[in-house]
Amino acid sequence: MIFVDSSALLKRYIQEPGSDLVDRVMREDSHWAASVLARTESEITLCRRLSGTGLHVDRVRRLGDEWHYITAVPVDADCLLRARAIGCDFSIRTLDAIHLAAAQLIPGRPAF
């Protein structure tokens, strides 16, 4: 299983450095997971970065279509407590800590 955060997920919809790698890895393993936050964060970013291009509507729709193939990991109170510890211990941003805490809730050892 591959766990993707918002920055990896966005590389499927916006061509940028790392997009080819993300596409290849996600083709090689069809079991994907992400925190429920990843969809909201990705859709808002697509709208913000692609507004005025006319592409944001299509890309948000594609993300919604593909979201059905992603195991959505809930962000609950336990996840947020875990995120707080990760964020404080490793001095990382809040959203990154939440994504990492959600990844820890997946059974087994997902790839990142």
Task: Write out the residue ranges for each language-model feature.
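Short, well-structured N-terminal submotif of metal-dependent ribonuclease cores
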Residues: 1-38, 49-61
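Preference for short coil/turn "hinge" residues that link or interrupt alpha-helices
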Residues: 6-7, 15, 30, 66-68, ...
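Hydrophobic side chains within alpha-helical segments
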Residues: 8, 44, 99-102
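Short glycine-enriched loop/turn motifs at secondary-structure junctions
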Residues: 25-27, 65-68, 106-107
